[in-house]
Every structure is written in C-alpha cells, then in structure tokens.
Amino acid sequence: GERDSVIRVNMTDTLFRMQLPFVPSRVLPNTDGRGYGVFVPDEPALHWLAAHWWEIEDDTARQSLLMGLYENYLAKHISADDWVNSLITGLPAEKNALVASTASGYLANVMREIAPANRAEVEARIYTMTQNHPLPSCRIQLMRLFMQNAISEPMVKKLYILWQQQSDKHLNRQDYTTLAYELAIRMPLESEQILRTQRARIDDPDRLRQFDFISRAAVSDTARLDTLFNSLLAAENRRIEPWTTAVIRYLNHPLREDQSVKYIRPGLEVLEEVQCTGDIFFPKNWAAALLGNHLSSSAYEEVV
C-alpha cells in the first residue's frame, strides 16, 4: 500500500535532483511551509492537490499546500474555474479555523475571474456554506464575501431579504450598512428606498455622519456620482480619509466598471496632491480604491 514519506532537502538553486529508493505516486513540495518561493509540482501532482487538498490530515501541511496551490493559480498553472471549484469543494469539510479563513480569502480574490456560465452555481454553493459551515467564523467571513460579490438575481434577492429582516445575528450593524450600499448599487430602481431605510436604522450621530458621506456613492444617478467624484479632487472634501477611500471604492465598484473608467486619469493626476495633504497611507489606499476593481483594457490604457 501507499504511505507518505517526508524528505528534507537543502535547496540552494532553482533545481534540485536526487535519487529515490522507490517510485513516488506524487511529489508534494513544501509540506511543512518552511520553504520560500513558488513551488511548482508536476502536472499530475498539481491536479491531485487541487482535487484532494482537504483530505490531508496534518493541519500545517494542508495550510502550506493550499498556499502553494494559490501561488500556482497566480502563476497561471491552474485556471480560475478549477481553482474556485477546488476551494468550494474542499471548504465545506474544513474544520481548522485558520485554513478555512485562508481558503475563504482565496475565494474572495478569484470571484471576478469565474466564467459567467459558472457564476450562479458558484454563488449558490457559497450561500449554502454561509448557512451550514461548521465554523461560525467561516460562515461570517463567507457571508461578507457573498455580500460583496453576489450578482445573480436569486442570490441578490436572498441578500435583500436578509437585509430587510436583519435575520443573520452573526452580522453586526456595520455589516448591514455595508449590505445596504451593495444592494443599492445592485438594485438601482430601489436604491433611494434602500438607503433611506438604512439611514433610519442608524441612531449614533457619528455613524450617521459616516453614512451620509459614503452613501452618496451608492445612488444610481450618474450625474450625482460624477459630481461626487469631482468634489473629492479638492483636499477640503476628503479630510476623513477612510470615508473618502470607501467612496472612491464604491464609485469604482465592479458593477460600475464601464462608467467609472473616466475617474482613473483625474484620480491619478491628483495623487501627488493626495500624498502631500493626507496621511502616509492615504495615497496607497486612494490608488487601490481607484484601480483595484478595474480589469478592462480601457482601464489599462488610462494608466500607461
């Protein structure tokens, strides 16, 4: 029968050759996580890992190999759809909170790369995990991921009912406010009503000020959105930097990618002024909010 063998090597170059006293069925690199760099298994081992990582009993090895799979996805050795399928197949069985959190984070990073034909099924499987995953912390993380990424009509409807009833007790008040922003963007005909209802739920004066500042970016009127963006080019209108970053992010929401390309160049042109007038981290946050949701060639042309 098969058994696992751990062989430690001292790699000083990109290639290491050694003789084995047996014929391995697969070679899984860096199972203890001590190696640094991208470890690329051969194709059979990579496919096996993608289909079986959750079956590995040792928590450290499972975490390390999951990280290795992610690195191979980034290196284009695994397709986005295969990677998503691997994550949503293995994640329901994951009982280690750290490994589950890592897998959920990887899932968030790849959602926009999924083929449109597979999107609805993936969203439905994620929603199922938000309801029945054995780890409460994972259910919360997945629900927050789901809130930010669901676009299929049945799943948006589920989110709307959740927001109306505030039925998930694991979510906090800020989660429901964030959900209101997301729903307002997804449901433009109901955006004013959603934002008005959410505002009425807020009784803390500071949170109300924050809501009034950020919610302007969730309305459906493009002229108002353009005016809002242009106002943020003036330093006096972006004094509260975390709120400003949130506004820029919603203005450049993935569902608004086509209409928000026009914000990129003026947003970058003011970056030096943002650096001079803001906190040391604000320029990075500004640029990330401005560019992070853009994947189009037209957006690329704005920055080259």
Where are these regions (language model features)?
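Short strand-edge motifs at loop-to-beta-strand transitions and within beta-strands
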Residues: 14-16
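Solvent-exposed serine/threonine-rich low-complexity stretches and specific carbohydrate-binding patches
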Residues: 6-10
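Long, ordered, helix-rich scaffold segments
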Residues: 3-4, 19-304
